Amino acid sequence: MKFPRKGIPQEEVMRELEKYTSKDLSFSSGKILGSMCTLPHELAKEVFCMYMDRNLGDPGLHPGTKKIEEEVIEMLSDLLHLERGYGHIVSGGTEANILAVRAFRNLADVENPELILPKSAHFSFIKAGEMLGVKLIWADLNPDYTVDVKDVEAKISENTIGIVGIAGTTGLGVVDDIPALSDLARDYGIPLHVDAAFGGFVIPFAKELGYDLPDFDFKLKGVQSITIDPHKMGMAPIPAGGIVFRHKKYLRAISVLAPYLAGGKIWQATITGTRPGASVLAVWALIKHLGFEGYMEIVDRAMKLSRWFAEEIKKTPGAWLVREPMLNIVSFKTKNLRRVERELKSRGWGISAHRGYIRIVSHASCDGGHD
Protein backbone atom coordinates (compact mmCIF):
# COMPACT_ATOMS: atom_id res chain seq x y z
CA MET A 1 0.00 0.00 0.00
CA LYS A 2 1.31 3.44 -0.96
CA PHE A 3 1.07 6.59 1.12
CA PRO A 4 -2.07 8.37 -0.21
CA ARG A 5 -1.57 11.73 -1.89
CA LYS A 6 -5.11 12.86 -1.22
CA GLY A 7 -7.23 12.02 1.76
CA ILE A 8 -10.68 10.42 1.76
CA PRO A 9 -13.80 11.28 3.80
CA GLN A 10 -13.96 10.08 7.40
CA GLU A 11 -16.98 7.91 6.64
CA GLU A 12 -15.02 6.00 4.04
CA VAL A 13 -12.07 5.64 6.40
CA MET A 14 -14.36 4.14 9.04
CA ARG A 15 -15.87 1.73 6.54
CA GLU A 16 -12.40 0.52 5.56
CA LEU A 17 -11.41 0.13 9.19
CA GLU A 18 -14.53 -1.91 9.86
CA LYS A 19 -13.65 -4.19 6.96
CA TYR A 20 -10.34 -5.03 8.62
CA THR A 21 -11.37 -5.09 12.27
CA SER A 22 -14.44 -7.22 11.61
CA LYS A 23 -11.97 -10.09 11.31
CA ASP A 24 -10.82 -9.50 14.91
CA LEU A 25 -12.23 -11.17 17.98
CA SER A 26 -13.44 -8.69 20.58
CA PHE A 27 -13.45 -9.11 24.34
CA SER A 28 -17.02 -7.83 24.42
CA SER A 29 -18.08 -10.89 22.39
CA GLY A 30 -17.26 -13.15 25.32
CA LYS A 31 -15.45 -15.55 23.00
CA ILE A 32 -11.84 -14.76 23.91
CA LEU A 33 -10.88 -17.53 26.32
CA GLY A 34 -7.10 -17.64 26.11
CA SER A 35 -5.99 -14.09 26.86
CA MET A 36 -4.68 -12.76 30.15
CA CYS A 37 -6.04 -9.35 29.19
CA THR A 38 -9.74 -8.61 29.32
CA LEU A 39 -12.40 -6.06 28.46
CA PRO A 40 -11.44 -2.82 30.23
CA HIS A 41 -13.78 -1.42 32.86
CA GLU A 42 -16.15 1.27 31.54
CA LEU A 43 -14.68 3.90 33.87
CA ALA A 44 -11.18 3.08 32.66
CA LYS A 45 -12.24 3.46 29.03
CA GLU A 46 -13.83 6.83 29.76
CA VAL A 47 -10.78 8.17 31.59
CA PHE A 48 -8.37 6.82 28.97
CA CYS A 49 -10.22 8.51 26.11
CA MET A 50 -10.52 11.78 28.04
CA TYR A 51 -6.78 12.14 28.67
CA MET A 52 -5.16 10.63 25.58
CA ASP A 53 -2.90 13.67 25.10
CA ARG A 54 -1.02 13.24 28.40
CA ASN A 55 2.63 12.26 28.00
CA LEU A 56 4.43 11.00 31.09
CA GLY A 57 7.65 11.03 29.11
CA ASP A 58 7.60 14.80 29.63
CA PRO A 59 6.34 15.16 33.22
CA GLY A 60 7.23 18.84 33.34
CA LEU A 61 4.24 19.45 31.06
CA HIS A 62 1.93 17.21 33.08
CA PRO A 63 2.80 17.50 36.78
CA GLY A 64 -0.69 16.44 37.81
CA THR A 65 -0.43 13.21 35.85
CA LYS A 66 3.06 12.63 37.30
CA LYS A 67 1.60 12.97 40.80
CA ILE A 68 -1.11 10.46 39.88
CA GLU A 69 1.55 7.95 38.80
CA GLU A 70 3.32 8.38 42.13
CA GLU A 71 0.04 7.65 43.91
CA VAL A 72 -0.55 4.57 41.75
CA ILE A 73 2.88 3.21 42.71
CA GLU A 74 2.09 3.98 46.36
CA MET A 75 -1.18 2.04 46.14
CA LEU A 76 0.41 -0.89 44.32
CA SER A 77 3.21 -0.93 46.90
CA ASP A 78 0.63 -1.07 49.68
CA LEU A 79 -1.18 -3.92 47.93
CA LEU A 80 2.17 -5.74 47.76
CA HIS A 81 2.98 -5.14 51.45
CA LEU A 82 5.60 -2.46 50.94
CA GLU A 83 5.42 0.80 52.88
CA ARG A 84 7.35 2.77 50.28
CA GLY A 85 8.03 1.52 46.78
CA TYR A 86 9.59 2.97 43.65
CA GLY A 87 8.55 2.31 40.08
CA HIS A 88 6.48 3.17 37.06
CA ILE A 89 3.49 2.18 34.99
CA VAL A 90 5.01 0.91 31.76
CA SER A 91 3.96 -0.67 28.47
CA GLY A 92 3.49 -4.15 29.92
CA GLY A 93 5.05 -7.07 31.73
CA THR A 94 7.77 -7.40 29.11
CA GLU A 95 9.12 -3.90 29.73
CA ALA A 96 8.76 -4.34 33.49
CA ASN A 97 10.76 -7.57 33.46
CA ILE A 98 13.46 -6.02 31.27
CA LEU A 99 13.74 -3.08 33.67
CA ALA A 100 14.20 -5.41 36.64
CA VAL A 101 16.95 -7.37 34.89
CA ARG A 102 18.61 -4.12 33.80
CA ALA A 103 18.59 -2.82 37.37
CA PHE A 104 20.10 -6.04 38.72
CA ARG A 105 22.77 -6.04 36.02
CA ASN A 106 23.69 -2.39 36.48
CA LEU A 107 24.09 -2.76 40.24
CA ALA A 108 26.13 -5.95 40.03
CA ASP A 109 29.87 -5.68 39.50
CA VAL A 110 29.97 -8.76 37.27
CA GLU A 111 31.77 -9.11 33.95
CA ASN A 112 29.70 -12.06 32.70
CA PRO A 113 26.28 -11.61 34.31
CA GLU A 114 23.89 -14.55 34.70
CA LEU A 115 20.22 -14.65 35.65
CA ILE A 116 18.63 -17.79 37.10
CA LEU A 117 15.00 -18.32 36.16
CA PRO A 118 12.46 -21.16 35.89
CA LYS A 119 11.89 -22.97 32.62
CA SER A 120 8.31 -21.70 32.96
CA ALA A 121 9.39 -18.04 32.78
CA HIS A 122 7.90 -15.66 30.24
CA PHE A 123 9.68 -15.14 26.91
CA SER A 124 10.29 -11.50 27.84
CA PHE A 125 13.33 -12.67 29.80
CA ILE A 126 14.82 -14.03 26.58
CA LYS A 127 14.51 -10.53 25.15
CA ALA A 128 16.04 -9.10 28.32
CA GLY A 129 18.99 -11.46 28.12
CA GLU A 130 19.68 -10.64 24.49
CA MET A 131 19.29 -6.88 24.94
CA LEU A 132 21.33 -6.64 28.13
CA GLY A 133 24.02 -9.22 27.51
CA VAL A 134 22.85 -11.37 30.41
CA LYS A 135 23.17 -15.14 30.17
CA LEU A 136 20.00 -16.98 31.16
CA ILE A 137 20.42 -20.01 33.41
CA TRP A 138 17.28 -22.12 33.27
CA ALA A 139 16.20 -23.97 36.41
CA ASP A 140 14.25 -27.22 36.26
CA LEU A 141 10.63 -27.60 37.30
CA ASN A 142 9.08 -29.95 39.84
CA PRO A 143 6.37 -32.42 38.77
CA ASP A 144 3.77 -29.80 39.80
CA TYR A 145 5.40 -27.27 37.42
CA THR A 146 6.77 -25.03 40.18
CA VAL A 147 10.46 -24.19 40.02
CA ASP A 148 12.86 -26.64 41.67
CA VAL A 149 14.42 -24.46 44.37
CA LYS A 150 17.26 -26.94 44.93
CA ASP A 151 18.16 -26.70 41.25
CA VAL A 152 18.09 -22.90 41.50
CA GLU A 153 20.58 -23.08 44.38
CA ALA A 154 22.78 -25.51 42.48
CA LYS A 155 23.04 -23.04 39.60
CA ILE A 156 24.12 -20.04 41.70
CA SER A 157 27.62 -18.84 40.84
CA GLU A 158 29.83 -15.79 41.24
CA ASN A 159 28.24 -14.47 38.04
CA THR A 160 24.65 -14.61 39.31
CA ILE A 161 23.12 -11.13 39.33
CA GLY A 162 19.57 -12.17 40.20
CA ILE A 163 16.94 -14.87 40.60
CA VAL A 164 13.45 -14.87 39.08
CA GLY A 165 10.32 -16.44 40.53
CA ILE A 166 6.91 -16.52 38.84
CA ALA A 167 3.61 -15.72 40.55
CA GLY A 168 1.19 -16.91 37.90
CA THR A 169 2.95 -18.62 35.00
CA THR A 170 1.69 -17.89 31.51
CA GLY A 171 0.75 -21.44 30.66
CA LEU A 172 -0.65 -22.83 33.90
CA GLY A 173 -1.05 -19.96 36.34
CA VAL A 174 1.38 -21.67 38.71
CA VAL A 175 2.84 -19.75 41.66
CA ASP A 176 6.41 -20.72 42.49
CA ASP A 177 7.60 -21.26 46.05
CA ILE A 178 8.52 -17.61 46.41
CA PRO A 179 9.14 -17.85 50.19
CA ALA A 180 11.83 -20.49 49.58
CA LEU A 181 13.33 -18.44 46.75
CA SER A 182 13.33 -15.40 49.02
CA ASP A 183 15.22 -17.27 51.73
CA LEU A 184 17.68 -18.50 49.13
CA ALA A 185 18.19 -15.00 47.75
CA ARG A 186 18.87 -13.61 51.22
CA ASP A 187 21.27 -16.42 52.09
CA TYR A 188 23.37 -15.68 49.01
CA GLY A 189 22.89 -11.90 48.94
CA ILE A 190 21.25 -12.03 45.50
CA PRO A 191 18.19 -9.94 44.53
CA LEU A 192 14.96 -11.78 43.72
CA HIS A 193 12.54 -10.52 41.07
CA VAL A 194 8.97 -11.81 41.05
CA ASP A 195 7.10 -11.80 37.77
CA ALA A 196 3.53 -11.34 38.98
CA ALA A 197 2.33 -9.73 35.76
CA PHE A 198 -0.79 -11.89 35.98
CA GLY A 199 -0.90 -12.99 39.60
CA GLY A 200 -0.30 -9.55 41.08
CA PHE A 201 -3.94 -8.58 40.64
CA VAL A 202 -5.19 -12.04 41.66
CA ILE A 203 -3.22 -13.46 44.58
CA PRO A 204 -3.76 -10.69 47.19
CA PHE A 205 -7.52 -10.92 46.72
CA ALA A 206 -7.63 -14.71 46.40
CA LYS A 207 -5.71 -15.09 49.66
CA GLU A 208 -8.21 -12.79 51.37
CA LEU A 209 -10.96 -15.05 50.01
CA GLY A 210 -9.34 -18.04 51.68
CA TYR A 211 -7.47 -19.66 48.79
CA ASP A 212 -4.31 -21.43 49.91
CA LEU A 213 -1.61 -19.61 47.97
CA PRO A 214 2.00 -18.86 48.93
CA ASP A 215 3.20 -15.40 49.82
CA PHE A 216 4.85 -13.76 46.82
CA ASP A 217 5.36 -10.09 47.54
CA PHE A 218 7.46 -7.66 49.57
CA LYS A 219 6.35 -9.32 52.79
CA LEU A 220 9.25 -11.61 51.89
CA LYS A 221 12.52 -9.78 52.56
CA GLY A 222 14.40 -11.33 49.65
CA VAL A 223 12.00 -9.91 47.06
CA GLN A 224 13.50 -6.75 45.56
CA SER A 225 11.19 -6.11 42.60
CA ILE A 226 7.79 -7.17 41.31
CA THR A 227 6.13 -6.98 37.91
CA ILE A 228 2.38 -6.39 38.18
CA ASP A 229 0.13 -5.61 35.22
CA PRO A 230 -3.06 -3.58 35.70
CA HIS A 231 -4.05 -4.30 32.09
CA LYS A 232 -4.56 -7.96 32.92
CA MET A 233 -6.75 -8.78 35.93
CA GLY A 234 -6.67 -5.11 36.93
CA MET A 235 -9.14 -4.40 34.08
CA ALA A 236 -7.19 -1.38 32.84
CA PRO A 237 -6.83 -0.46 29.15
CA ILE A 238 -3.71 -1.59 27.30
CA PRO A 239 -0.92 -0.49 27.74
CA ALA A 240 -0.59 -0.63 31.53
CA GLY A 241 2.12 -2.82 33.00
CA GLY A 242 3.83 -2.08 36.27
CA ILE A 243 7.21 -2.42 37.97
CA VAL A 244 7.74 -1.82 41.69
CA PHE A 245 11.17 -1.84 43.37
CA ARG A 246 11.83 -2.18 47.10
CA HIS A 247 14.64 0.40 47.09
CA LYS A 248 15.24 3.59 45.14
CA LYS A 249 18.74 2.42 44.21
CA TYR A 250 17.25 0.09 41.60
CA LEU A 251 15.42 2.94 39.89
CA ARG A 252 18.50 5.15 40.02
CA ALA A 253 20.58 2.38 38.44
CA ILE A 254 18.48 2.47 35.27
CA SER A 255 17.77 6.22 35.04
CA VAL A 256 19.18 8.43 32.29
CA LEU A 257 19.10 12.21 32.01
CA ALA A 258 16.78 13.83 29.46
CA PRO A 259 17.87 17.48 29.81
CA TYR A 260 15.80 19.01 27.01
CA LEU A 261 12.38 18.19 28.48
CA ALA A 262 10.13 20.76 30.14
CA GLY A 263 11.44 21.58 33.59
CA GLY A 264 14.95 20.34 32.77
CA LYS A 265 17.00 17.66 34.52
CA ILE A 266 14.33 15.01 34.00
CA TRP A 267 15.53 11.48 34.75
CA GLN A 268 13.90 8.58 32.92
CA ALA A 269 14.06 4.98 34.10
CA THR A 270 11.68 3.43 31.57
CA ILE A 271 12.62 1.99 28.19
CA THR A 272 10.06 4.08 26.35
CA GLY A 273 10.55 7.83 26.34
CA THR A 274 7.03 8.83 25.41
CA ARG A 275 4.59 7.15 27.83
CA PRO A 276 0.79 7.40 27.74
CA GLY A 277 -0.39 9.24 30.82
CA ALA A 278 -3.92 8.11 30.00
CA SER A 279 -3.02 4.58 31.09
CA VAL A 280 -1.83 5.78 34.48
CA LEU A 281 -4.91 7.93 35.00
CA ALA A 282 -7.17 5.00 34.11
CA VAL A 283 -5.37 2.72 36.57
CA TRP A 284 -5.65 5.32 39.33
CA ALA A 285 -9.37 5.79 38.64
CA LEU A 286 -10.00 2.03 38.71
CA ILE A 287 -8.17 1.42 41.97
CA LYS A 288 -9.94 4.35 43.63
CA HIS A 289 -13.33 3.24 42.29
CA LEU A 290 -13.13 -0.52 42.87
CA GLY A 291 -10.95 -0.64 45.95
CA PHE A 292 -9.75 -3.88 47.51
CA GLU A 293 -13.28 -5.16 47.99
CA GLY A 294 -14.23 -4.50 44.37
CA TYR A 295 -11.23 -6.40 43.06
CA MET A 296 -11.93 -9.16 45.54
CA GLU A 297 -15.39 -9.62 44.02
CA ILE A 298 -13.88 -9.79 40.52
CA VAL A 299 -11.31 -12.38 41.59
CA ASP A 300 -13.91 -14.35 43.53
CA ARG A 301 -16.02 -14.86 40.43
CA ALA A 302 -13.01 -15.60 38.22
CA MET A 303 -11.67 -18.20 40.65
CA LYS A 304 -15.07 -19.86 40.98
CA LEU A 305 -15.42 -20.00 37.20
CA SER A 306 -12.03 -21.66 36.85
CA ARG A 307 -12.87 -24.26 39.52
CA TRP A 308 -16.18 -25.00 37.84
CA PHE A 309 -14.50 -25.41 34.46
CA ALA A 310 -11.79 -27.66 35.92
CA GLU A 311 -14.47 -29.95 37.33
CA GLU A 312 -16.22 -30.05 33.95
CA ILE A 313 -12.97 -31.08 32.27
CA LYS A 314 -12.62 -33.94 34.75
CA LYS A 315 -16.07 -35.17 33.70
CA THR A 316 -15.22 -35.03 29.99
CA PRO A 317 -14.06 -38.30 28.40
CA GLY A 318 -10.75 -37.96 26.58
CA ALA A 319 -9.77 -34.74 28.36
CA TRP A 320 -7.70 -34.21 31.48
CA LEU A 321 -6.15 -31.37 33.46
CA VAL A 322 -2.45 -30.66 33.17
CA ARG A 323 -2.62 -29.84 36.89
CA GLU A 324 -5.13 -28.50 39.40
CA PRO A 325 -5.46 -24.73 38.88
CA MET A 326 -3.84 -22.43 41.42
CA LEU A 327 -5.24 -19.20 39.98
CA ASN A 328 -7.96 -18.56 37.39
CA ILE A 329 -6.15 -20.39 34.59
CA VAL A 330 -7.20 -23.89 33.58
CA SER A 331 -5.05 -25.90 31.19
CA PHE A 332 -6.05 -29.27 29.82
CA LYS A 333 -5.05 -31.90 27.29
CA THR A 334 -7.15 -34.05 24.99
CA LYS A 335 -6.48 -37.13 22.91
CA ASN A 336 -7.11 -35.10 19.75
CA LEU A 337 -5.71 -31.73 20.76
CA ARG A 338 -5.22 -30.22 17.30
CA ARG A 339 -8.65 -31.31 16.14
CA VAL A 340 -10.29 -29.84 19.24
CA GLU A 341 -8.29 -26.64 18.78
CA ARG A 342 -9.32 -26.33 15.12
CA GLU A 343 -12.96 -27.02 15.94
CA LEU A 344 -13.09 -24.42 18.70
CA LYS A 345 -11.40 -21.80 16.52
CA SER A 346 -13.73 -22.57 13.60
CA ARG A 347 -16.63 -21.75 15.91
CA GLY A 348 -15.13 -18.36 16.71
CA TRP A 349 -13.54 -19.12 20.07
CA GLY A 350 -10.25 -17.40 20.87
CA ILE A 351 -8.23 -20.03 22.69
CA SER A 352 -4.56 -20.54 23.44
CA ALA A 353 -2.92 -23.83 22.51
CA HIS A 354 0.13 -23.62 24.75
CA ARG A 355 2.91 -26.22 24.54
CA GLY A 356 0.69 -29.19 23.91
CA TYR A 357 -2.38 -28.18 25.88
CA ILE A 358 -5.26 -25.73 25.73
CA ARG A 359 -5.28 -22.86 28.20
CA ILE A 360 -8.44 -21.12 29.37
CA VAL A 361 -8.30 -17.90 31.40
CA SER A 362 -11.50 -17.02 33.25
CA HIS A 363 -12.23 -13.32 33.67
CA ALA A 364 -15.07 -11.69 35.55
CA SER A 365 -16.14 -8.47 33.86
CA CYS A 366 -17.27 -5.39 35.71
CA ASP A 367 -20.96 -6.18 35.16
CA GLY A 368 -20.73 -9.70 36.54
CA GLY A 369 -20.42 -11.42 33.17
CA HIS A 370 -17.38 -13.29 32.01
CA ASP A 371 -15.22 -13.99 29.00
Curated annotation (Swiss-Prot):
GO terms for molecular function: aspartate 1-decarboxylase activity; pyridoxal phosphate binding. It catalyses: L-aspartate + H(+) = beta-alanine + CO2. The modification N6-(pyridoxal phosphate)lysine is found at residue 232. Its EC number is 4.1.1.11. GO terms for biological process: carboxylic acid metabolic process; coenzyme A biosynthetic process. Disulfide bonds: none annotated. Pathway: Cofactor biosynthesis; coenzyme A biosynthesis. Its cofactor is pyridoxal 5'-phosphate. PROSITE patterns: DDC_GAD_HDC_YDC. Keywords: Decarboxylase, Lyase, Pyridoxal phosphate. It comes from the Archaea. It holds the Pfam family Pyridoxal_deC. Belongs to the group II decarboxylase family. MfnA subfamily. HAMAP family: MfnA_decarbox. Catalyzes the decarboxylation of L-aspartate to produce beta-alanine. This is Probable L-aspartate decarboxylase. It comes from Pyrococcus furiosus (strain ATCC 43587 / DSM 3638 / JCM 8422 / Vc1).
